């Protein structure tokens, strides 16, 4: 039964990540979540191909 829930969790994750990417689109290089006194920031540093 645990395997069934793990499979569902992986499927949900695999659907959520592309959906989030489509929603965020151009501003994907920086992601910030602010809640009360906590701020979570993820920044992607990359160099585009020339």
Swiss-Prot record:
Organism superkingdom: Bacteria
InterPro entries hit by this protein: Hok/gef_toxin
Membrane-spanning ranges: 5-25
Cell compartments where the protein resides: Cell inner membrane
Pfam families found in the cross-reference section: HOK_GEF (PF01848)
Any one GO CC term of the record: plasma membrane
Record keywords: Cell inner membrane, Cell membrane, Membrane, Toxin-antitoxin system, Transmembrane, Transmembrane helix
Main localization (coarse): membrane
Membrane topology reported for the UniProt record: Single-pass membrane protein
The protein's role, per its UniProt record: Toxic component of a type I toxin-antitoxin (TA) system. When overexpressed kills cells within minutes; causes collapse of the transmembrane potential and arrest of respiration. Its toxic effect is probably neutralized by an antisense antitoxin Sok RNA.
Family: Belongs to the Hok/Gef family.
Protein name (record): Putative protein HokF
Gene: hokF
